[in-house]
A protein has these predicted regions:
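C-terminal accessory/tail domains of diverse enzymes
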Residues: 1-65, 78-257
Length: 257
């Protein structure tokens, strides 16, 4: 988990967290007083405790968020090409919900670009699973060869990492990265977002059905997509209510503008 924030005392956060294994650094997408806290990789209850520790430290030292800030979640995931193809289509299907439960600034953000502006359902389905990496990199680079693709996958920095769903991270370091969420120092918001992402990843890994995913894409409105996701992912009522309430909140903001 990478938490971006602005406006506080960088040195105090560094002194509090660096010795506990957290990464603490500046971020080029933020102002000079910006910070990125990288929560150590962990599982289960420990993730919850570490995220809470980071959020409390940021708030204690005066940090908040602006529309420049994002929340990036990395989750270790199997890298078999067929599974990656399924995950790409499922994330494409979920994107309207992801953007609808976040501020409009995320949709128009250079650092979390939507898949649906560069990919189509048809091309994802028709692409051979063994060439899904080539399809992903082709959205930023012309005249790709397999040699170039192999080179890209060994490099830390690549322009394709700025999609809301960053497959480059999986090819490079075996973690999928989701960049859709707006910046927050709320421990509860972060953990609910992680719970939703994990439910999606588990579905793709163990219960994936392409026809179900296509039906999700065909749902005519965000609320119907959320209700369909609840059934598909077996989401509990509190998480579903949270997602719906965020959708209503940001829809009202849009209507007021």
């Amino acid at each position: 988990v990478e938490i971006e924030a602005e406006g506080g005392d960088y040195d105090d956060v560094y002194d509090d967290l660096a010795d506990e294994g957290f990464g603490v650094q500046g971020d080029g997408s933020l102002d000079e007083d910006g910070i990125e806290v990288q929560v150590p990789a962990s599982n289960g209850d420990n993730t919850d405790k570490l995220v809470q520790r980071a959020c409390q430290c940021l708030e204690k030292n005066g940090f908040g968020v602006s529309k420049r800030c994002g929340l990036h979640v990395h989750i270790e995931y199997p890298s078999q090409m067929r599974t990656i193809k399924h995950l790409l289509l499922m994330t494409y299907a979920c994107e309207p919900v992801f953007y609808a439960i976040n501020p409009q600034s995320r949709l128009n953000n250079t650092y979390c670009q939507p898949l649906n502006k560069r990919f189509s359902v048809h091309e994802i389905i028709q692409t051979n699973a063994q060439k899904i990496d080539e399809l992903f990199y082709s959205k930023k680079y012309a005249d790709l060869t397999r040699s170039k693709v192999r080179t890209f996958k060994r490099m830390k920095w690549n322009d394709c990492r700025y999609f809301g769903f960053n497959l480059h991270s999986l090819f490079y370091q075996k973690t999928v990265e989701f960049r859709y969420h707006a910046g927050t120092t709320s421990h509860q918001k972060i953990m609910r977002w992680i719970t939703l992402l994990k439910a999606i990843l588990l579905y793709v890994r163990f219960r994936y059905n392409q026809e179900d995913v296509l039906r999700l894409i065909e749902q005519p409105a965000v609320l119907s997509k959320i209700r369909y996701l609840k059934q598909l992912l077996k989401l509990d009522e509190p998480l579903t209510d949270y997602i719906i309430n965020r959708y209503i909140k940001f829809r009202m903001h849009l209507c007021a503008e």
